[in-house]
Amino acid sequence: MSNLSNLDNLFAPTVQAPIQEKELIEWRPSFRNAPNKTYTAIVRFVPWWQDPSNSILEKFSCYLENPYQPNTGRTVDSPSSIGEKDPISDTYWLLKNSGNAINVENAKKFSRTQKYSMLIQIISDSVNPKLNGKILVWRVGKKVYEKIATEMTPVIAGIQPRNPFDIINGRAFVVKITEASGFNNYDNCQFVDIDKSQSCLKLTEKQEDGTYKFVEAVSETSDKQKVFDFLQANSPDLGKFKYQPWDEETVRYVDSVIAFYTGRTASGAPAQPIASPQKTASLESI
């Protein structure tokens, strides 16, 4: 990899991200938004200028419905993301292994999802062409992550590993999202070989109409500082997608949800009787 490709001497974890105007920072492609229920785009992965060694941020989270207020809830990051004890996961297994059908069903309410967040630059978006050239955060599940991992560490002998975050040599990623049982299906997404001038990082300028004008295809002769300044100014703050520790309000909320379904708080202390005990079986005997 060239010196320009990794920019290690310019990336600075201690440098604060610039204050950005409120605008679209996350790419959320879905078959639901596409003609014929097939969303197609070409993207390239972009290193996180503040910490390139952590250009993929992984975490578990859970959407906890509020049992006291129907149709409300909040997403809570799982402490297991950083190897800490997780009351949400503990409650899931407590209910799952209870042997009671109602509790087993309620365990689903504490099921976690695993997401990987990273930066991408849109090369071509057939559904939202105004995004072409823009750098956004893309949160993906295990299917896309495994394709990235295989690109970096091939499972077949003889295939050379490639770094998709290499701003010059990283391959383009074709996104083709179809529908499968009402969900997004990523089976047809893949890395492809296209001309390097098309797949490399592009320096762009935002126009008055909201589109992005391509200024320069980054190459070995590009000015390092110019490239770094572009990434710093145009990349959303990926740090916002890291695991977020629980504040006191989150602790109280999680405790209240756990107490509703188990009769005890996350710490194991007895809770007040729930308002609708018929919604769950008692766990005091478990």
Predicted regions mapped to residue ranges:
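OB-fold ssDNA-binding interfaces and closely related basic DNA-contact patches used
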Residues: 1-165, 244-252, 256-259, 286
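Terminal short linear interaction segments
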Residues: 280-286
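Compact mixed alphabeta submodule
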Residues: 124-280
